[in-house]
Design a protein with these regions (language model features):
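Short beta-strand elements
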Residues: 202-213
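Amphipathic hydrophobic-ligand
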Residues: 69, 97-105, 152-156
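Positively charged n-region of N-terminal signal peptides that target proteins for export
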Residues: 1-4
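Mid-length scaffold segments of soluble, non-membrane domains
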Residues: 86, 93-107, 115-117
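Acidic, glycine-rich flexible loop segments
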Residues: 149-176
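Bacterial Sec-dependent signal peptides at the C-terminal "C-region" and cleavage site
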Residues: 13-30
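Sec-dependent N-terminal signal peptides
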Residues: 7-12
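Tryptophan-anchored aromatic micro-motifs
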Residues: 25-75, 91-93, 120-149, 157, ...
Length: 234
C-alpha cells in the first residue's frame, strides 16, 4: 500500500512538472515584457467583441520612438471588428511636428484568464464580475506613404478586460488606483518607408511597456530627466 501511494505521488509530481514546463514553453513565443505580466493566467476560450476596450480613450496614450526615447503621440480614431479575431483601425501619429495618418489591423492571438484576480480598492469589486483576463494580440499600422516621415508599426499588444455578471466584456480599470496600473500596452518597431531602417516604438495608457529607464515615476509615469529634451519638456 505504501509503495502504491509513493508511486501515485511520484506520478502526480511528474505530471505537475510536465504541465509547468508545457506552460513555460508556450509562453516563450511572446516577448518577455508580456510574459512577466501574464504568469498568473491561463488560456481561455472566449467569444467577445473587444472594440470598446481597444477604443477606450479615458486617458491619452504615452509613447516613445527610437533609442533616444523621442516622445511619440498616437490616437486611435476608429476601431471596428471585421472578423472573429481581427479589428481594423485608423488613427493619427505625431512625432515632434510631423503628423501622419494610419490604418491597420489588430489580430487577437490568445485570450487568458487570471487565476487569482484581485478585487480593487478595499475589495469593492468582489462579487461584481465573473472573471478578469487579458488578451495578447499583434498589430500592424501602416502610415500614409504619401506623407513625410511615414512608415509601418508592427508588434505585440496586451490589454486587460473583465467580464461582468451579465456577460459583458469591458475595459479593466479595477486597479487604476495602483501605481503600476496600465492598459492597452503596445510595443514593437517602426520601419521607415524611405530608408527601410527600424526603430523601437512603444506606447500605452498610464505606463509605457518595454521602455527601459524612460519612466522613473513611482505613483505615475514620469519621464527620466535625461530624456526630457526629446519632446517631453513641453
Amino acid at each position: 500500500m505504501t509503495r502504491k501511494i509513493a508511486c501515485s505521488l511520484l506520478l502526480l509530481i511528474l505530471v505537475t512538472i510536465g504541465l509547468n514546463i508545457k506552460t513555460k514553453v508556450g509562453l516563450t513565443r511572446y516577448p518577455s515584457w508580456i510574459v512577466a505580466k501574464i504568469v498568473d493566467s491561463k488560456p481561455v476560450k472566449l467569444t467577445a467583441d473587444f472594440t470598446h476596450v481597444l477604443s477606450n480613450s479615458s486617458t491619452a496614450y504615452i509613447g516613445y520612438i527610437g533609442n533616444n526615447y523621442q516622445k511619440f503621440d498616437i490616437s486611435l480614431q476608429s476601431v471596428h471588428k471585421s472578423t472573429a479575431n481581427r479589428y481594423t483601425v485608423t488613427g493619427v501619429t505625431m512625432v515632434r511636428t510631423n503628423r501622419c495618418n494610419f490604418q491597420g489591423t489588430i489580430d487577437v492571438v490568445e485570450n487568458r484568464q487570471f487565476s487569482h484576480p484581485t478585487f480593487g480598492l478595499d475589495n469593492s469589486m468582489k462579487g461584481q464580475f465573473k472573471r478578469r483576463g487579458c488578451t495578447i494580440a499583434k498589430y500592424r499600422f501602416a502610415e500614409n506613404a504619401q506623407q513625410k516621415g511615414s512608415g509601418v508599426f508592427v508588434g505585440y499588444l496586451l490589454f486587460y478586460w473583465y467580464e461582468t455578471n451579465k456577460g459583458e466584456i469591458v475595459y479593466d480599470d479595477i486597479d487604476d488606483f495602483s501605481d503600476s496600473y496600465s492598459n492597452n500596452q503596445y510595443a514593437g518597431t517602426w520601419q521607415s518607408y524611405a530608408t527601410k531602417k527600424s526603430k523601437p516604438c512603444a506606447w500605452g495608457q498610464y505606463r509605457v511597456p518595454n521602455s527601459g529607464d524612460l519612466d522613473v515615476g513611482a505613483a505615475e509615469f514620469s519621464v527620466n530627466p535625461k530624456y526630457a529634451r526629446n519632446g517631453w519638456s513641453k
